[in-house]
Amino acid sequence: MKHADLSQRQLRVGEQVRHALAHMLQRGILLDDALKDVVFSVSEVRMSPDLKIATCFVSFLNTVDDISRATLIKVLNKHSRFIRGEISSSLRQMKYMPELRFRLDNSFDNFSKIDALLRLPEVARDLHHHKPED
């Protein structure tokens, strides 16, 4: 689902959930030993149309391989009820507390791949060659 497909309400509530998650993470509540030394960011939260499901996209900033990232996503999903309870006080205005589902956000990895491609000598030469004159 693209941003254009989401209503203003879904976008607003998603941002509120993201802020509540960020606030909880800043307090340093450790959920699991697997998350002890992991630095991660909740980059986006997308709400379902009925606002009962929040899909939370997470980027890990200091993990190397995809296997450990997948494991960490499983750990977050395992503790989603606890996290939901922790953020509920920040979201008291909501009629229903959404179910949290954590997913890996690959946008930073995709950006890195595109950046690396654009830095290739062949691509840089082509881009420079087709540059319009001022």
Curated annotation (Swiss-Prot):
PROSITE patterns assigned: RBFA (PS01319)
Record's subcellular location: Cytoplasm
InterPro entries noted in UniProt: KH_dom-like_a/b, RbfA, RbfA_dom_sf, Ribosome-bd_factorA_CS
Alphabetical keyword list: Cytoplasm, Ribosome biogenesis
Known role: One of several proteins that assist in the late maturation steps of the functional core of the 30S ribosomal subunit. Associates with free 30S ribosomal subunits (but not with 30S subunits that are part of 70S ribosomes or polysomes). Required for efficient processing of 16S rRNA. May interact with the 5'-terminal helix region of 16S rRNA.
Similarity-based family: Belongs to the RbfA family.
Protein name: Ribosome-binding factor A
Naturally occurring in which organism (per UniProt): Bartonella bacilliformis (strain ATCC 35685 / KC583 / Herrer 020/F12,63)
Recorded name of the encoding gene: rbfA
